[in-house]
Amino acid sequence: NKDKSRKKKKPKCIALATATAVSLEGTRESPLPASGSCEKVLQELQDTQQLGEPLVVTETQLSEQLLETEQNEDQNKSEQLAQFPLPTPIVTTLSPGIGPGHDCVGGASGGAVAGGCLVVGAGTDKTSELIPGKLESAGTKPSQERPKEESFCCVISMHDGIVLYTTPSISDVLGFPRDMWLGRSFVDFVHHKDRATFASQITTGIPIAESRGCMPKDARSTFCVMLRRYRGLNSGGFGVIGRAVNYEPFRLGLTFREAPEEARPDNYMVSNGTNMLLVICATPIKSSYKVPDEILSQKSPKFAIRHTATGIISHVDSAAVSALGYLPQDLIGRSIMDFYHHEDLSVMKDTYETVMKKGQTAGASFCSKPYRFLIQNGCFVLLETEWTSFVNPWSRKLEFVVGHHRVFQGPKLCNVFETSVSAKPKISEEAQNRNARIKEDIVKLLAETVSRPSDTVKQEVSRRCQALANFMETLMDEITRADLKLDLPHENELTVSERDSVMLGEISPHHDYYDSKSSTETPPSYNQLNYNENLLRFFNSKPVTAPVELDPPKVESSYVSSARGEDARSTLSPVQGFEGSGGSGSSGNFTTGSNLHMSSVTNTSNAGTGTSGTGNSGDGGGGGGADGTGSGAAPPVTLTESLLNKHNDEMEKFMLKKHRESRGRSGDKNKKSANEAMKMLEYSGPGPGHGHGIKRGGSHSWEGEANKPKQQLTLNTGGGGGGGGGGGGGGGGGLPLFLDVTHTSSSSQNKGPTGVAAGGAGGGVGGGGGSCSGLGGNGNVGSGNGNNSQPSTNQYTQSGLPCTQNINLWPPFSVGITTPTSVLSSHTAVPPSSFSPQHSLFPTFYYIPASIAASSPSSTNTNPNRPHKHAHVHSSSEKPSTSQAAAATMPLQYMTGVMYPHPSLFYTHPAAAAATAMVYQPVPFAGVANPMQLPEQASKNVYTTQPVMVAPPTATNKTQGAFHSITPAPPQRPSSQATSVKAETGSNVAPSDTSKKEVPDSPITPTMGDFTLDQPCNNNATTLKKYTDSNGNSDDMDGSSFSSFYSSFIKTTDGSESPPENDKDAKHRKLKSLDQSDNKIVEHPEEDQTQHG
């Protein structure tokens, strides 16, 4: 069976090859055939084989088709009839080369001989363009005797490179008998120097064919090779072996085809490669010259030669072959200098100099003088060349030179392909050396950097532009430096770690971290205002206590009238609450004033009414409860480190902006609120509220800085005001507990959380709200006082941002209180920034004289007009810049003789605090120290002694719980207050504070005991204890400012420990103060909006 199948396949293949040959011969002018016709014939052969029809029938059918196609060519017909009926002798030639392993020769794959055959179409250009569809039509052309073919075609299997078919014209072109190539490798007939070129064309052509879907007409490539001529007896006689082999140049057109796969009779699966066929159409290349020294016309074809800057030829057009006699591969890689006539080298040097000059302009070209060029047969042709070059735009180096050549005069020998016989011309040594030097000079010239004519001018212009740009940048820096500073605070990416450190009560987070954040904007101002410098400024400022506060807060009538604004004051943030403790009415005013600076803060706590006084503060907190209810449900109540960070960022931004304004244009910044600015500047205003303002004036910068973190706490607290209406507002009465912001955020101590809860809890602190979960969970303090149930925390929550007024404190240190105030007014909505400047700049604690405090503690929220010294102290500490007004309106009362933490602890609107401060009597800065102590006490005592605090909510002294300082006003302080004092030995509660409270002049007491002096402010403290003061902010401010100040300032006392607690409480207070703020907002929504606006 195998033998039979082989026999059948062989005739089929022969018939196919013959048919293809005939069709090619008959279609000289037709495009190269596609695989369609061949496949058609092959398919018919396969069909007949499958049907089991006799092979003779298949042969007959094929011959008939071919006859029809070549009707007009009798000679072709006779050849077909003779060859198709029986296997011709070619079969014997094929069989040896195709053994059993080459079954594909039988064309089982549809003409894919030898497994898969690549069809390479090589022949004349016309023949190579044959299209399968035109095979039949070609035969219709008038028949004439087949002329001597100029080209031939052959089919080669890509499986093994064997020639499967050749057209009869091969005999005319190369002299080989038609069947001599069959079964032999095509490469054997290619000149050895061109075999690499042929192989590279095959390897690159196959991928092209595959990528184009093996479309033969699309995958055609052309190249030139030398093919061997036949050495026959006719041409050379009998000495075949001794004669040299002659080669002739041919242009080959390659076309890849893929024959269709089909099942083999023996079930042998044909691989993809077996289907590839290569059709080659070979066309001989003739010399362009007819006569020696021929002068060619201007229309003669041009050819291009490209060489690199080193003179190495990199590309040659195939059109140059007939003109020069070199194949492209013969020239590529050689030096162009070797082909110039030695006498023309000087001319070529001039030409290349012009090339370099023209290279300065992209795309420029020029024609050079004619010069002589060596061709393959050893003669010279005269060339006219148009030169262009390409210069690398980045390196400005010449990449390559392209010469478009036209032969002006031909060689003496017309056949350019003859072997060169002439010997090299004799040249003297001197001439050779000169020529070598010229060649080297040309190469060096081409290697030079190409400079553009305009480069010099452009460089000069660029230098001038750069100098001008630098000059303008310098001017802009000087002119817009303040603006840049202002923009910086708005950035949201202030260093969180630094803020956190402040909140956590690190040693010197306030100023150092703030400086680092703002170092880019105002590095000098922040770097100069280091912590030690802030302390020195604070002490040197000798801030006046309550009496020093000016009426500028009063100027804001709404803030000034502490009595009429009782309710609003109760809603004020903790800072305001403290001021309001003396005259809780101020907290209402604070709402208005703070609204100017930070409308968001004050409005909320309006619900907590003027009862912000120490005793009434609890009531005020209750009023805030309504607002607190709204905010209490809000998750934000929980004070988290992230919220504190966010708040600190805002406060820091505000403080930076405020500081810039104060330094660059303190007057301009004050435009937003001239009254507030005046308040800030005149910290020693006569009004009781001035106590707060004085405190701010004395240490705006540090207070503002400290306030930042505290205000952040307040913001966090705002959410949790809940039922408590803000611990500070409800229970806080006049004395919101001061918790270290740091502690609150960390919530490591139970007291810190308790302070928060106090804001939420109805107790003296939270006013029954107790919803300040964010600050510290349930407020034990809150449970005690129903009076404090009013949610003043909301005020703090809403007004937490407004507390930014406190920021004014920070700039005042560096610039002046007035500037901080203006900054606060502009940044009213950003309480953290307002507090933080103060925080960072100055110690958290201020000492408030006991004498002033004594008068103020007597009156609780009941007497809104009468400012409590404690509240004043607190507001002064909290609002030296922004808190002054706020404190006046705030129900919080500062305890005389107690050091209160920075106003930033109280998350009250700095503006509101400032306004309130104006109204209230000036409170000694000792009050600031009190708040600082209070936070610790508050955090410790409030949690532990909350029941005691709750019991005396009516007593104004309960406010002490917030400040928790043992001051000469112990009577006001409830039993819980006493407990608080015990708990916070290092905080305001220290017993020694009582005596110090009496000394209003001392801004800061050396020990924590001094800070405790603000005990009188504790009227609200009992209920608020730590953060219970009218606005939980007090504690918050105390916490953040106190913690940092404590760590750096009061390491000897419990203060270091209390700051964390205070921070926690401060957070609680902030929440409470936010609730109170909400209440206030209800009372003075218009003012609040104005502030926010």
UniProtKB/Swiss-Prot annotation:
PTM comment, free text: Phosphorylated with a circadian rhythmicity, probably by the double-time protein (dbt). Phosphorylation could be implicated in the stability of per monomer and in the formation of heterodimer per-tim.
Protein name, UniProt field: Period circadian protein
Organism: Drosophila willistoni (Fruit fly)
CDD domains: PAS (cd00130)
Keywords: Biological rhythms, Cytoplasm, Nucleus, Phosphoprotein, Repeat
PROSITE patterns in UniProt: PAS
Disordered: region residues: 557-637, 681-735, 781-800, 856-885, 960-1093
Protein origin, superkingdom: Eukaryota
